[in-house]
Amino acid sequence: MDLKVKVDRSRDVSQPLDKLGPDETLKANSDQLRGTIAQSLADPITLAVDPSDNKLMKFHGIYQQDDRDIRDERRRQKLEAAYSFMARVRLPGGVCSTSQWLKLDELGRAYAGNTLRLTTRQTFQLHRVLKHHLRPALQGLREVVLDTKAACGDDTRGVMATVNPLVSKVHADVYALAKQASEHALHRTGAYREIWYEEERDPSTVKSAPDGSEEPFYGRTYMPRKFKIGFAVPPSNDIDVYAQDLGFIAIVKRGKLAGFNVAIGGGLGRTDQAPKTYPRLASVIGYVGVDKLFQTIDAVMSVQRDYGDRVDRLHARFKYTIDDKGLDWIKAEIERRLGFELAPAALYTFTSNSDPLGWVKGEDGHWHCTLFIQNGRVINHPGQPLMDGLREIARVHKGHFRITPNQNLIIADIAPEDRPAIEEVMKEYGLDAFETRSQLRLNSMACVALPTCGLAMAESERYLPDLISKIEPLLERYGLTDEPITIRMTGCPNGCARPYVAEIALTGRAPGKYNLYLGGGFHGERLNKMYLENVGESAILDALDKVLGHFARERTPGEHFGDFAIRAGYVAEVKEGRYFND
């Protein structure tokens, strides 16, 4: 590849700030993410923060939201919106100790409406935290060595890793590398400590980078947009590695972790009214040994840092940089920065992106139990005090917890002699109810959406369980109750629940209206395609009745629902993301 080919640099970091989007100026002039956040927190007149600080606080893992259920009523009463904040914990690989769980339980009860939310990127979210509770909440996290740094914003977000780290030595090794990757890619500014822990500014952090900033890698303007990293261990693709900006697929040789296939340019966010936006699956470009992992992370991220679009944020993700510049050019530039060529990708096989629920024994003889947590919502339901039950398990459990990328929870590292005690708590609190659920429900996932997400156009978490209850009679009619089919719902097209790789997906368009997609790959290897646009519940159920019935009658042995939807002609196969909207 000829690296001397001229590429368009009119929209990247090489340009003056006044030629770029306003967020670039905001970041550059933010004093390394400090802004006036401290002053906004101290303002007693409003429940909100300054709009500029609201953007900067995302780098601190915090989103300003409001209760949309009462937004119109408060507007009629000429009151400010009911503002609160969501704080997202940085938890690489989803690993959580029992002491950390108990602290999060305490914070959820004190500051977040008696609930916790497990996310699709293996972490916790605390919703409805009031402005004056943010510092106490984040300082509480610090007590158990947790924080919310870089959980949002134009940085690396949370680093994912296939669970369960204790099932095998390879899983443990991959988790350790994912945790190191999270620290390696973390921004270095002291803003977080100063604002949330109220520490004095450390003079040693100033001018540690060539541009005089505190960020040797990121500089003053950080990344063009979010950048997601994930580690998958075949045959499980639970992290949806093809949906990551940078994915590492573990390659095992003679029972040991040898290295990783490198996949770049995944990302599922899109906008319905902007056809230039589309989901894209990551492209596998080669293989690196474990010893080259962090060098590879730096090389790939630096290409996006330097060449990503900083004019149009709808076009700023790495997937667009790759499609604009060309995959061959991007790969060659990565290799130039590495100083060596990537080896050919090694063979691997994925079989599923779902969670095996129930009990499994690890190589060391210890047990692990995966619990179904519907849509990741940890809360006390009538007849099923889930939050209380998990708190009780945390009190008696001697191992750890693992949050899965499907918003479920693993009680991990249970010694054989301790299993009866765990089973007793599970039975007492109804935590084993997943054993009677349909496979469709067990393979479902929804984003939070209303009432707290400002981007949601329709319900998601609060609606999907009810919709599944109306689909389940169809499954029973056609003998498909035990057939694993992935279904995912989001309240908008941005894709937080990774809907565009599901076999059935619904994305919100307006209250009660959704786009219906079919044909995603069972293990996340293929994008789905729109089947119906902007339809309500009755049309969704009628469509699924037709397709599920056809599937039950004419499927071939071992054929998955998504594969059938394409073979039967309900939707066309999407070969590349750029053709998703065709």
Curated annotation (Swiss-Prot):
NCBIfam families: CysI, PRK13504.1
Family stated for the protein in its record: Belongs to the nitrite and sulfite reductase 4Fe-4S domain family.
Region annotated Disordered, chain positions: 1-26
Entries under HAMAP family matching the protein: CysI (MF_01540)
Superkingdom of this protein's organism: Bacteria
Database matches in InterPro entries: CysI, NiRdtase/SiRdtase_haem-b_fer, Nit/Sulf_reduc_fer-like_dom_sf, NO2/SO3_Rdtase_4Fe4S_dom, NO2/SO3_Rdtase_4Fe4S_prot, NO2/SO3_Rdtase_4Fe4S_sf, NO2/SO3_Rdtase_FeS/sirohaem_BS
Free-text remark on how the cofactor is bound: Binds 1 siroheme per subunit.
Pathway assignment: Sulfur metabolism; hydrogen sulfide biosynthesis; hydrogen sulfide from sulfite (NADPH route): step 1/1
Compositionally skewed regions (Basic and acidic residues) per UniProt: 1-12
Gene designation per UniProt: cysI
Organism: Afipia carboxidovorans (strain ATCC 49405 / DSM 1227 / KCTC 32145 / OM5)
Subunit description: Alpha(8)-beta(8). The alpha component is a flavoprotein, the beta component is a hemoprotein.
Substrates-to-products reaction catalysed: hydrogen sulfide + 3 NADP(+) + 3 H2O = sulfite + 3 NADPH + 4 H(+)
GO molecular function terms listed in the Swiss-Prot or TrEMBL record: 4 iron, 4 sulfur cluster binding; heme binding; metal ion binding; NADP binding; sulfite reductase (ferredoxin) activity; sulfite reductase (NADPH) activity
Protein's name according to its UniProt entry: Sulfite reductase [NADPH] hemoprotein beta-component
Residues that, per the record, bind siroheme: C496
Functional description taken from the UniProt entry: Component of the sulfite reductase complex that catalyzes the 6-electron reduction of sulfite to sulfide. This is one of several activities required for the biosynthesis of L-cysteine from sulfate.
Positions that bind [4Fe-4S] cluster: C447, C453, C492, C496
One Gene Ontology cellular component annotation held by this UniProt entry: sulfite reductase complex (NADPH)
Cofactor: siroheme; [4Fe-4S] cluster
